[in-house]
Amino acid sequence: MGFSTTHLLIFLVIIIVIFGTKKLRNIGSDLGGAVKGFKDGMKEGSDKAADAPAAAPQQVASSATAAKETIDVEAKTKA
């Protein structure tokens, strides 16, 4: 039920006939460039994360100022 070497060769020939070798070469180079760009981006991201110092945690605003800004409301239910 699996694919044999003959099946894969026939499939490859059909793909080459449909798309042509130039188009397949362009697709391959575009895909390779995308993978290379992704790998470079991952390297830059990890380098920046290692170089950046850990930020000190900021204190949360006091509850007194939060209480002044809070609006107290009551929910009404439908009868």
Curated annotation (Swiss-Prot):
Biased composition (Low complexity): 51-63
Segments for region (Disordered): 43-63
Database matches in InterPro entries: TatA/B/E (IPR003369), TatA/E (IPR006312)
GO cellular component: TAT protein transport complex
Bilayer disposition of the protein: Single-pass membrane protein
Entry's transmembrane regions: 1-21
Biological process, per Gene Ontology: protein transport by the Tat complex
Pfam families hit by this protein: TatA_B_E
Domain of life of the native organism: Bacteria
GO MF term (any one): protein transmembrane transporter activity
Keywords: Cell inner membrane, Cell membrane, Membrane, Protein transport, Translocation, Transmembrane, Transmembrane helix, Transport
Subcellular localization: Cell inner membrane
Family: Belongs to the TatA/E family.
Protein function: Part of the twin-arginine translocation (Tat) system that transports large folded proteins containing a characteristic twin-arginine motif in their signal peptide across membranes. TatA could form the protein-conducting channel of the Tat system.
Subunit structure: The Tat system comprises two distinct complexes: a TatABC complex, containing multiple copies of TatA, TatB and TatC subunits, and a separate TatA complex, containing only TatA subunits. Substrates initially bind to the TatABC complex, which probably triggers association of the separate TatA complex to form the active translocon.
Protein name listed in UniProt: Sec-independent protein translocase protein TatA
Natural source organism: Albidiferax ferrireducens (strain ATCC BAA-621 / DSM 15236 / T118)
Protein's gene: tatA
